[in-house]
Amino acid sequence: LLLFFPLHSIQAVQDVNEEVTNDLSGYSNKKHQSEINNVKYSKKNIDELGFILYDLIQQRDFDVINKIIDNYVSHKDHDKELVKYIYSEKAMLNNEYNLAIRLYNEILIHKPNMLLVELKLARALTYVKHYEAALSIYQNIKTKYSGGISSKLVEYIENKIIYLENKNRWQGMVKLGSSYDFNLNEASNSREMYCFRSKCMNSSNQSIAGGKWHYYIKSTKRFPLVGNHSGLLSFGAFGLEPMKTVTARKINIFISGGYQFENANTKIGILPIFEAKWHDNQYYNLSLGGKIATEYTLNHRVTILGDFEYKNKTHPHEYSFNDGDKWIYSLFGTYLVDSQLVAFGGIHGANREKQRNSDSYSQYGIRAGFLKVTGLCDFLVAVGYKQTNFEQFDVYLNVKRKDQNRYLNAQVTFDKNKILTFTPSIYFNSQVNKSTADIIYSFKQSEVGVNFTKKF
């Protein structure tokens, strides 16, 4: 569930006012005000107006700045670099990062040793995902101003260097867990019996309970190309080990790699897909295809995510009737209600073509929920509905199958309580599937489980 929306949205709001401006305001007031407002004027009132404008920048009071800056610029002795700095800060406030970057660079051409402007430039480059350029600036600052800046500022710069260096290192996640299905049963309340070619089956309300162990491993590496462009390689595995015979042993191995574009508010990935599956220690199928993943940040509150995926599935001879194509698509949005609450929702669907039209289907669904962050834990809830329509009448089932599935997912994550560096979480899943092929495919299921997750 956590894959359906970007959890960094909450953290971004919590951190947005702790960036360079707050960390450096006191430092810049003392050391760099005189550099930006180099007193070269013969008229005292212009000097004073320049200092007033700089103080207003520190207070982020652009309404007042807009009222007086025209008078300042109209004077022939105004400080052109101060004006550029004002416009660059205003551009940052309006998310016009490329304009701000251009103005910061123009200032540094004339005044190359302005620490505050260098830091602001590095921050702006990070916003537009020019990670390598931002890293180079921070490393240059660390060398150039070694011994001449406060310990707090040194710590800030070192943290930024570590953050940017990690962008091009292997990153991933390991998840270990266990779950228990405590009322997996058939949903039909009747004692129906269905017979076909001398073989019969009947409905039962007897619950089937059982547990399973599961693991998930994924690792991803970014390979910088130029500017906003990069390559991406990802691989991992998912496994399920049943405690009883309720479910089969499963192993999925996947590899993908391709191209990624990122800027301040857009991310686009084009990724080939290789996926192999094993069931009960036997090879089950191979999927080859590709995926287009997009993410667009409309503003600091709204993010839209869209995916389109294609796979061609091939099976061993005994399962070759499942060979065919699968298309998967989704469109989701997240809304940041406040610094501790994110709401999300969207639509998703799939089309599956198999050798038999009676096994081929189209599926569509809707999902909505929220994530609440508290001092004790993070609480995630999602509800959804999906409908699956099969293409043709199934002579074996004596019906044209149509399934309707309703589900609830809830998870509590104790992010501040590590166990051997792993983050614990508990979850509950419940679903009811109602099918026109009632005897076989209607069921109810409830599951409770625990996960231990480590990110690296």
Outline where the language-model segments fall:
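Amphipathic alpha-helical repeat scaffolds of TPR domains
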Residues: K44-F51
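Gram-negative and organellar
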Residues: A12-N37, L53-Q58, D63-N66, I86-N95, ...
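Flexible helix-coil transition and linker loops at the boundaries of alpha-helical arrays
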Residues: N37-V39, N71-K76
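Classical Sec-dependent N-terminal signal peptides that target proteins to the secretory pathway
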Residues: L1-A12
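Short coil turns that delineate tetratricopeptide repeat
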Residues: D77-H78, P112
